[in-house]
């Protein structure tokens, strides 16, 4: 949502998974699907957010600490990293730094693709098979890849996901 919005000169947001109710939304990959929106005017963007995010709900989370996830920052381009570090040094000089995981970016991406692809296979492939729509070669290649994902690959990817979740949870101090 954010990248297409920025290319079109719009504001766009992709909220946290499950933050907005997805009832009535056709599932693609339910473990990852979320509802986002675009708008050109800030007033419209805000009104949509007020409706979709239901601002009457308040979080019960109490944040006592904030941290910098160094391994996530390392993914950013060098210029972005440097500017971010300057800002942190200036505004939050004592902030703690953590590493969320020992797993590599490529391992995480590969397992994400398996889990997401399997959900696409379960949710979208039956519709495509039945309706035979015209699909771009790029999307067709992704659908083809998803159709070949095995149950064993999914099982291993779920084990990997559980390991990643535990690593992230264990890396964060209380109250973050």
Task: Locate predicted features.
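Fold-level recognition of mixed alpha/beta catalytic cores in primary-metabolism enzymes, strongest
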Residues: 1-69
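Amidase signature
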Residues: 54-176
């Amino acid at each position: 949502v954010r990248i297409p919005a920025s290319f079109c000169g719009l504001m766009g947001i992709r909220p946290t998974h499950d933050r907005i109710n997805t009832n009535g939304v056709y599932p693609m990959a339910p473990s990852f699907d979320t509802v986002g929106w675009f708008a050109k005017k800030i007033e419209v963007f805000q009104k949509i957010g007020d409706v979709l995010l239901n601002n009457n709900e308040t979080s019960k989370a109490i944040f006592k600490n904030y941290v910098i996830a160094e391994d996530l920052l390392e993914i950013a381009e060098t210029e972005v990293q440097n500017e971010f570090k300057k800002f942190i040094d200036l505004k939050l000089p004592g902030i703690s730094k953590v590493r969320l995981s020992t797993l590599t970016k490529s391992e995480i991406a590969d397992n994400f693709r398996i889990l997401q692809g399997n959900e696409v296979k379960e949710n979208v492939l039956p519709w495509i098979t039945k309706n035979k729509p015209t699909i771009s070669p790029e999307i067709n290649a992704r659908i083809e890849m998803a159709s070949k994902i095995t149950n064993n690959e999914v099982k291993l990817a779920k084990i990997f996901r559980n390991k990643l979740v535990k690593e992230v949870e264990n890396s964060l101090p209380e109250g973050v």
